[in-house]
Amino acid sequence: MLHILCQGTPFEIGYEHGSAAKAVIARSIDFAVDLIRGKTKKTDEELKQVLSQLGRVIEERWPKYYEEIRGIAKGAERDVSEIVMLNTRTEFAYGLKAARDGCTTAYCQLPNGALQGQNWDFFSATKENLIRLTIRQAGLPTIKFITEAGIIGKVGFNSAGVAVNYNALHLQGLRPTGVPSHIALRIALESTSPSQAYDRIVEQGGMAASAFIMVGNGHEAFGLEFSPTSIRKQVLDANGRMVHTNHCLLQHGKNEKELDPLPDSWNRHQRMEFLLDGFDGTKQAFAQLWADEDNYPFSICRAYEEGKSRGATLFNIIYDHARREATVRLGRPTNPDEMFVMRFDEEDERSALNARL
């Protein structure tokens, strides 16, 4: 997996990302265009109008992130609107038209810390678009995350020990002035605690479309289950655990209807809770949970199967909060294509300390 270290001003960070991942970003854009056109059935002119509005909102409300997007576009030699599209793809594909995708996420508190993880399931073709980013910024924790090339926030953790996961939800609707999901993920990744991440996202005044974000460290974890008109907070159960898949667990507004989630979302949720009941608390056992193939191919470890399952688990990430490290398995955990561990050095730890001051 391509690994890019980005540092400096927001524009410089974006430029390094864009120039190093130029070819991969081109593939990400091609995929996003096909996905959005297929999901929304809207004309190019209608999509252009929505994209223009979302771009203006990002520029006005989060100029730092817009500068990074502008830097990516410059480095990748693409139009800024194309990078805006990548970073608002959820709002297009899920806000304008209910879509169906799967992921499984879990957090488990232990006597000496916590373990947190996710299987990220999506269309198999996007695996080649995944990259690994390390971003160093003055006054903020260093962040390390796995993302699709061109997208500024996704699944990862920071040198303050805050880890972030992301699941699709199926509440239709789009509020163009709300926070795009990938901007919210970046806000969480730049926070010094789960509580701060939750507060900072809520303070933005609402989300643009529906999704679920889990934020955890060694001491606490929260889930943000949101739609364009509501944000609900998921907390740990009596056993210090939290599990989420791709259906709503919390009550939203009476006019907000969940539209046809994947039936296996309930199966995966129940299966993960069942597996955690027998979990012995070791990292090795936690890692094995993500390779579970019960109800194959619609299992926690999802598999592509022609005519049945259109997606697959493209990567698994496990955060060991006691060790302050994350293990990534690219591909299905049963037979990964690549495995690596992400850690922070002393310089990164100092950045986290300074961010707390």
From Swiss-Prot:
Say if the entry is tagged with keyword Ligase: no
| One Gene Ontology cellular component | peroxisomal matrix
Q: What class of enzyme is it?
A: transferase
Q: In which pathway does it act?
A: Antibiotic biosynthesis; penicillin G biosynthesis; penicillin G from L-alpha-aminoadipate and L-cysteine and L-valine: step 3/3
Instruction: Enumerate the residues binding 6-aminopenicillanate.
Output: 121, 310
Q: What superkingdom does the record give?
A: Eukaryota
Q: Does the keyword Transferase apply?
A: yes
Q: Which controlled-vocabulary keywords does the entry list?
A: Acyltransferase, Antibiotic biosynthesis, Peroxisome, Transferase, Zymogen
Question: Which reaction(s) does its UniProt entry say it catalyses?
Answer: isopenicillin N + phenylacetyl-CoA + H2O = penicillin G + L-2-aminoadipate + CoA + H(+)
Q: What PTMs does it carry?
A: The pre-AAT protein is synthesized as 40 kDa precursor which is then self-processed into an 11 kDa (protein A) and a 29 kDa (protein B). The B protein carries AAT activity.
UniProt xrefs under InterPro entries: C45_proenzyme-like, Peptidase_C45, Peptidase_C45_hydrolase
* Compartment(s): Peroxisome matrix
Q: Which Gene3D superfamilies match?
A: 1.10.10.2120, Penicillin V Acylase, Chain A
Q: What is its EC number?
A: 2.3.1.164
Could you state one GO biological process linked to this protein? Answer: penicillin biosynthetic process
Q: What induces it?
A: The transcription factor rfx1 controls penicillin biosynthesis through the regulation of the acvA, ipnA and aatA transcription.
Q: Which GO terms describe its molecular function?
A: isopenicillin-N N-acyltransferase activity
Q: What does this protein do?
A: Isopenicillin-N N-acyltransferase; part of the gene cluster that mediates the biosynthesis of penicillin, the world's most important antibiotic. AatA catalyzes the exchange of the alpha-aminoadipyl side chain of isopenicillin N for phenylacetic acid to yield penicillin. This step occurs in the peroxisomal matrix and the penM and paaT transporters are involved in the isopenicillin N and phenylacetic acid import into the peroxisome, respectively.
State whether it acts alone or in a complex, and with which partners, per the record: The active form of the enzyme results from processing of the 40-kDa monomeric precursor to a heterodimer containing subunits of 11 and 29 kDa.
Q: Which family does it belong to?
A: Belongs to the peptidase C45 family.
Q: What is this protein called?
A: Isopenicillin-N N-acyltransferase
Q: What lineage does the source organism belong to? A: Eukaryota, Fungi, Dikarya, Ascomycota, Pezizomycotina
